Regions:
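Catalytic phosphate/metal-binding cores of nucleic-acid and nucleotide-processing enzymes, i.e., regions
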Residues: 1-92
Length: 92
């Protein structure tokens, strides 16, 4: 199962879409062990963003069992921060 977090973009074929931080965390909790790929946007048009999802993934060790975490954001600073967090705390 693959999930795609973005508040604006169309959901690519093969992905399940979520539009907000809260929806994403709820979906992750409901499907633990079933998700292989997560594609994250940074800017979600709300207080919490894709970086907050990355922090949740790290804090809950949700990366175990994931094949890929993809950052598809157009925000270069957000992308850099998300990648640094994941590179530092998630096993390769």
């Amino acid at each position: 199962m693959k999930i795609f977090l973005d508040d604006i973009r169309s959901i690519p074929r093969g992905f399940e879409g979520v539009r907000s931080y809260n929806d994403c965390i709820r979906y992750l909790n409901q499907n633990k062990g079933k998700i292989t790929d997560i594609s994250l946007d940074h800017d979600l048009g709300e207080i919490r963003n894709g970086y907050d999802v990355c922090k949740w993934i790290v804090e809950n060790e949700y990366y175990e069992g994931l094949e890929r975490i993809i950052i598809h954001s157009a925000n270069p600073v957000g992308v850099k921060n998300m990648l640094q967090l994941l590179d530092r705390y998630c096993p390769k």
